[in-house]
């Protein structure tokens, strides 16, 4: 009798001899996410698998900086002082999640209790409404191109976090950044 078995084990982050953190966490996922409009109302944006798992989107995360919080779009003129690590691989689909190999060189954010992850990226936002997995959405994100991966206190994706054992951490203040779309819509992100 021929059979197949797939043993599952949770991937844990490891520390190198130098104290760097190596991990392969979920960095984002598909689903409907709330965003606040400039007038305080909420809109709900769909990150559909057809867009999230597009190969050019998955390829765009490789080599991007891991940052301490979100600091706007990161490039060679503003990366010093905010970059704490790097994404070492392209994104890979794992169910509804995107995973990637990362290294964190400056671990002070993590040691201070921040272990959630939040992607910074550009996209085209379409006004499209519908229902996805029982959740209503009003907009759809397309053409996702990653710019950085931020270490934050609480990420929007919920399950995007480092694979660390829980320990007591100190509270830190989160930074908010305001983004304005070409159509004039503004929203805050952490």
Report residues per predicted region.
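Signature of dsDNA virion morphogenesis modules
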Residues: 1-172, 176-188
């Amino acid at each position: 009798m021929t059979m197949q078995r797939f043993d599952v084990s949770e991937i844990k982050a490891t520390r190198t001899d130098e104290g760097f953190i190596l991990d392969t966490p979920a960095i984002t996922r598909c689903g409907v996410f709330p965003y606040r409009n400039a007038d305080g109302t909420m809109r709900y944006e769909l990150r559909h698998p057809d867009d999230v798992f597009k190969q050019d989107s998955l390829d765009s995360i490789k080599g991007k900086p891991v940052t301490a919080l979100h600091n706007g779009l990161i490039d060679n003129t503003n990366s010093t002082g905010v970059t704490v690590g790097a994404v070492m691989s392209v994104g890979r689909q794992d169910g509804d999640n995107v995973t990637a190999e990362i290294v964190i060189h400056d671990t002070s954010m993590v040691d201070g209790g921040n272990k959630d992850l939040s992607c910074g990226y550009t996209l085209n936002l379409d006004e499209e409404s519908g229902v996805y997995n029982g959740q209503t959405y009003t907009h759809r994100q397309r053409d996702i191109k990653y710019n950085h991966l931020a270490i934050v206190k609480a990420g929007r994706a919920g399950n995007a976090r480092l694979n660390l054992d829980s320990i007591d951490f100190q509270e830190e203040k989160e930074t908010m950044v305001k983004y304005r779309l070409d159509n004039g819509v503004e929203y805050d992100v952490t």
